[in-house]
Amino acid sequence: MSVICTSILASILLYCLHMVVPEVRSQVQSKKTQKHISEVIKERIDTPDLPFSHEAWIRLHEENPDFQGYLMFQSELIKEPVVQSYDNEDYLHKAFNGSYDGAGTVFMESSASLESRNITVFGHYVYYDNSSRFTPLEKLLDQQGYEDNQVVYLFLGNEVRTYLVSAVFFITEDEAEYYDYSCPDMTEEEYKEWIAFINMKNVIDPIAGEADVRDRILTLQTCKKWDSSQRELVICREISRIPYPGGGEGNG
């Protein structure tokens, strides 16, 4: 793997060392943050028929310039704001508004751009709340759970990207040392190897087909329950980019 991509691995491994434990303060903060974001989204008037909009994106970006987009499963299994910082550790235990939150905020790989071929988004497995952050991703390990939750949206500043889940599996520390899955722009050979590995490890039967080297992918990562040496990865293939009605001026 490339030198740049290998350097990213340290941040990923450190991320999963932070086991989230029950914290009453964090639970209260998380619920307040989620309620506020939901209210901002509902108050918009530009596209009331859509679950998100350019107007909502602008308001949340004004509140936190690190805000990149809103990740939402069509089933609403997960609905989380996505931030990006210069440091992958920045939002491990920080709420969207900057206060302390043991469950942190879902964040995008610091070295990636929205035009990267592989965008990795990290979220905690929260032991005390099975609906928080990326904890619900474990439901996709079951075939029926995957089929019920296979469509994913990423709402950005001027468009919505639609993805289909194509693979779900666990990756070990040893495997992650070789396959630097969070690397945003792998070489052609690295990407080819990674896609082949994805399809080999996949534990689901993807209805819409396997991942392909021609795909742009969104990788969702969380920890495995009671095992910090492994991470669960959900691989999503991008299938469309659609501008909001009325447009917008870029993705930030």
Task: Name each model-derived stretch.
Residues 1-9:
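N-terminal Sec-pathway targeting helices
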Residues 13-252:
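Solvent-exposed, non-transmembrane regions of membrane-associated and secreted proteins
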